[in-house]
Amino acid sequence: MSTLGHQYDNSLVSNAFGFLRLPMNFMPYESDADWVITGVPFDMATSGRAGGRHGPAAIRQVSTNLAWEHNRFPWNFDMRERLNVVDCGDLVYAFGDAREMSEKLQAHAEKLLAAGKRMLSFGGDHFVTLPLLRAHAKHFGKMALVHFDAHTDTYANGCEFDHGTMFYTAPNEGLIDPNHSVQIGIRTEFDKDNGFTVLDAGQVNDRSVDDVIAQVKQIVGDMPVYLTFDIDCLDPAFAPGTGTPVIGGLTSDRAIKLVRGLKDLNIVGMDVVEVAPAYDQSEITALAAATLALEMLYIQAAKKGE
C-alpha cells in the first residue's frame, strides 16, 4: 500500500488537488521542494466531537479562495516565487489502526527530513503532532515548542492515543524543552508545574502583539522551533468547526499577526490541526486554518528572501 495518496477505500476524506492549487507530488522525497504539505486524516484520539479526519480536505478545498492572490496582503511578494512547495496528499493508513497511523506518519516525516525537506502538516486531531515531533527531534535534536491552543494538552493520565497528552509525553521523551517553549491562548484548566510558559487567552488578548512576540522570542531563543496551531485557539466566533471549542479565545486577526511575528524564529516544522468541518459555518474555520497555513509559509518565504 502506498504511504501517500488522494484516493483510498474511504476517499471522501481526501482531495484530488493541492493546497492553494500547488503541485501534487506523491513521491516528494526525490523532489526539489523546500516545503512539503501532508494531510493526516485522523481523529481517533479525539475526546470531544469527532470529524477532524475531514480537516485536510476542508482546508485544501477552501484554500482555492486564497490561491488567486499573487502577493498575499500585506506581503509585497508572491510566496510561490520564493518557496518551492508541493502537496503530497494524505497519509494512507488502515482506518481504525491508530498505531499504524503514528508509525507511518513518523516514518514519512523522517524520510522527508532526511531528504532536506521541511514539513507543513494538516490534521486531523492534535495527536498527529506527537509522531511529527518524534521525527523532527531525530533530525534536529531537542526543540522549542510554540503552541497555539485553548488547552495545554499536558494531561498525564490519558491513554496511548489521546489528543490531550502529547505535550506531557513529548518532554518526557526528550523531544522538546518546556523551559524554552510557550503555549498561547490557553483558557482551560492545566497543571501549573508542567514547565511550559503559558500565555493564557486573557493575557494575549489584553497585551499588544509586539509585547507577546517579544516574550516568545525571549523564551525560545535560538533553538529549533516546532510550531503547532490548534484551531480551537481561536474563539468559536471565528472557528466553530472544531472538536472542543472554548469561548474567550483569540480573534483570527490577532492570531495572524502573532504568526507573522514569529518570522525570525528558527522554525523547522509546522502544523495546523483540529479542523472538524461538520461543525463549521460557511467554511470559516477551514478558511481560518488555510489562511494561517498560508501565513506560516509566508514567514518562511520572507526569511528565505532576506
UniProtKB/Swiss-Prot annotation:
One Gene Ontology term of the molecular function aspect: manganese ion binding
Entry protein name: Agmatinase
EC nos: 3.5.3.11
Source organism: Klebsiella pneumoniae subsp. pneumoniae (strain ATCC 700721 / MGH 78578)
Cofactor(s) for this UniProt protein: Mn(2+)
Residues the record lists as binding Mn(2+): H126, D149, H151, D153, D230, D232
CDD domains for the chain: Agmatinase_PAH (cd11592)
Pfam families: Arginase
Cross-referenced InterPro entries: Agmatinase, Agmatinase-rel, Ureohydrolase, Ureohydrolase_dom_sf, Ureohydrolase_Mn_BS
NCBIfam families, A to Z: agmatinase, PRK02190.1
Catalytic activity from the UniProt record: agmatine + H2O = urea + putrescine
Gene: speB
Residue stretches spanning the membrane: none
Pathway: Amine and polyamine biosynthesis; putrescine biosynthesis via agmatine pathway; putrescine from agmatine: step 1/1
Family: Belongs to the arginase family. Agmatinase subfamily.
Keyword entries, A-Z: Hydrolase, Manganese, Metal-binding, Polyamine biosynthesis, Putrescine biosynthesis, Spermidine biosynthesis
GO biological process assignments: putrescine biosynthetic process from arginine, via agmatine; spermidine biosynthetic process
Protein role: Catalyzes the formation of putrescine from agmatine.
